[in-house]
Amino acid sequence: MNNLVLIRHGQSKFNLQRRFTGFYDVELTTKGEEEAKEAGRLIKKLNIEFDFYFTSQLMRAKNSLNIILKVLNKENVKINNAWELNERHYGGLTGLNKDETIKKYGDKQVKIWRRSFDIPPPLMESNHPYKNKIDSNILGESLKDTFERVMPYFNKKIK
């Protein structure tokens, strides 16, 4: 029987500022780096071995994995980076503070954008301040869109 271990990246600068992140590439905070080290220590303590390593192409995920691998003394393993594993694209919400967004649009609407399966957030427009900093033709995703992006990669490469 095979096991799949999923690890979320450590705290990022946007997490700390309570901003929607999605495809925007932000660095880990010092706390995020420590969280990744702690994940590595726990994996080591539990004596978990991996055959394959996968990560999104986002810096916060890649750096978290690299920190974990350093703790495990496995820095020379092959890492499979794939944009298909990137976090959900938050579209026009990218970079906005979550609390301010709730004040502006209301808690109910923000929950719809965040939690409904098939309703995406507002799409990222061409004049969005982060548009030129994100290398993607995707302008925003519902959870369904994200699922449909991730699952073909998962079924072909990971499963």
Which residues are covered by each model-predicted region?
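Short, basic/glycine-rich phosphate-binding loops at helix/coil junctions
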Residues: 17-19, 113-136
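Loop-to-helix element that buttresses phosphate recognition and phosphoryl-transfer chemistry
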Residues: 11-67, 71, 134-151
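Active-site beta-alpha turn of Rossmann-fold NAD(P)-dependent dehydrogenases/reductases
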Residues: 8
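Disordered, low-complexity tails and leader-like regions
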Residues: 106, 151-152
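Short, intrinsically disordered, charge-balanced linker/junction segments flanking boundaries
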Residues: 154-159
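Phosphate-coordination/substrate-recognition cap region in phosphate-metabolizing enzymes
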Residues: 39-125
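A short, terminal or domain-edge coil/loop segment
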Residues: 102-110, 130-144
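Extreme N-terminal starter segment of soluble prokaryotic enzymes
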Residues: 1-5
